[in-house]
Design a protein with these regions (language model features):
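Positively charged n-region of N-terminal signal peptides that target proteins for export
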Residues: 1-4
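Hydrophobic h-region of N-terminal signal peptides that target proteins for export
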Residues: 6-17
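Amphipathic alpha-helical segments
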Residues: 21-35, 67-79
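Surface-exposed amphipathic alpha-helical segments
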Residues: 24-34, 124-153
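Short, solvent-exposed coil/turn segments at beta-strand boundaries
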Residues: 28-31, 47-51, 90-92, 113-121
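Short, surface-exposed coil-to-beta transition loops
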Residues: 38-42, 53, 103-111, 120-121
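A short acidic-to-branched-hydrophobic micro-motif
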Residues: 43-71, 121-127
Length: 153
């Protein structure tokens, strides 16, 4: 009996620490997002519409030395072979890498420079058929970051 109770407490302890407390999972699911990975330091979710595929990673990383830029560089160097790197830029809110796939679609990697939560880093993969120019891309980045940040408590 003691082992059963201990096991239940251990399981509840693991479950309660699995997702970052600052992510509103109920709101995510209400807005048709699917939770892909739910761990203490990595939380991934995404959704696909007719025009856009969106995957978001929220990372809890204790290091602060320009981590957002490092994450952006990692995305660039770790991209799949079928994704051809096109360009890189940054605006006030994010580092953005642009890739073109063999099928003609475009993938935009968006890494937020700062978030309202300490040690929280947001990385977004935005896939679309559209080839955004700089001004258009800035609007997409702002809109997407605003939406993702709305799921943070």
């Amino acid at each position: 009996m003691k082992k059963i109770i201990l096991t239940i407490f251990l399981i509840l302890g693991v479950v309660s620490f699995a997702a970052p407390k600052y992510v509103d999972k109920v709101k995510l699911q209400k807005n048709s997002y699917q939770i892909i990975q739910d761990e203490a330091d990595v939380f991934l979710f995404g959704k696909s519409t007719e025009d856009v595929g969106l995957t978001v990673g929220i990372y809890n990383i204790q290091e602060n030395n320009d981590m957002a830029k490092k994450i952006s560089e990692e995305v660039k160097t770790g991209a799949p072979a079928e994704q051809k790197f096109v360009s890189s830029r940054e605006n006030k809110r994010a580092y953005v890498n642009k890739f073109k796939a063999n099928d003609g679609s475009y993938t935009y990697s968006i890494v937020a420079k700062k978030t309202k939560i300490k040690n929280c880093y947001i990385s977004i993969i935005y896939i679309t058929a559209k080839d955004f120019k700089d001004n258009e891309l800035d609007k997409v980045v702002d809109k997407t970051l605003n939406e993702v940040e709305s799921y943070l408590k």
